[in-house]
Amino acid sequence: MRLKKLVLDVLFVGVVVLGLLVISQRAKAMYSERLNHNSLSQKAVIFKTKSHQSIQSTIQAIDQTKLNNFQVQFNVNNHLSYVYAKGKQANVPLKDGRFFSNYDFKSRIPVVVVGQSRVNELYQPTSQAYYQTKNRYLSVIGVVGTNQTTSLDQHVFISASPEFVLNNRSLNQVTVLVDDQQIGAHLKEYQKIFKTKSISNLTPKNTPIIGVNWLRENGTAAIILVLLIIVARGA
């Protein structure tokens, strides 16, 4: 009996350790996924619109509402986004400088935040670095990134405001993403502004609890551990 109890205790500890590993892996997977989605949360929604309304007109329409604590990204491509936000925003991992403030989203002068892999492309005659777009140089206020290698490293974010949008495009030329923790309550209002009912989740709802690579490396051990517990309890 003592041996059986000892075996069960050891196996129980193994299950606890395995559970902690699963939780840790899930947290790492979620964080990595967030970084690959321009640091937007799992609640972020993609609005697919064919509207010819300009980005600036759209921001002006949003500014007239009571919406707060949100971030909107107008993605030109996989490496460039115009950003407008109001109120509290999710934390972005910074290597240097700062992320956009509410003041930047009211200013007529756009500023830039770049991923750490884009730093070498910047023009830096003094301590201030600049991002060149066509014939214009924009002040860089921050560098984002972590020790992980993610798509965030390659991204360029340019602030936008009701007063000015650089290279103002129409909505059908960009991908519109909204990160709002109250998206369910505000969804219809956003749909009205973006002139569309077509939406999708940035993060698929069927995202696995743990990563595929983790299952490949540890799945067999987990199955064996469970089987041993079953055998020990039946002995």
Listing of model-derived features with the role each one plays in the protein:
Residues 116-157, 164-172, 184:
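Mid-to-C-terminal secondary-structure elements
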Residues 48-51, 115-117, 179:
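Structural motif
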Residues 73-123:
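Short beta-strand boundary microenvironments
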Residues 176-216:
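A cross-kingdom feature of multi-pass membrane systems that activates on extracytoplasmic/periplasmic
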Residues 58-62, 125-130, 186-195:
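Short amphipathic alpha-helices in soluble, non-transmembrane regions
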Residues 21-93:
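Membrane-proximal extracellular/periplasmic loop immediately following the first transmembrane helix
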Residues 4-28, 210-235:
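Hydrophobic alpha-helical transmembrane segments of multi-pass inner-membrane transport and secretion
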Residues 53-57, 120-122, 182-187:
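Short, charged/polar "capping" segments at the starts of alpha-helices
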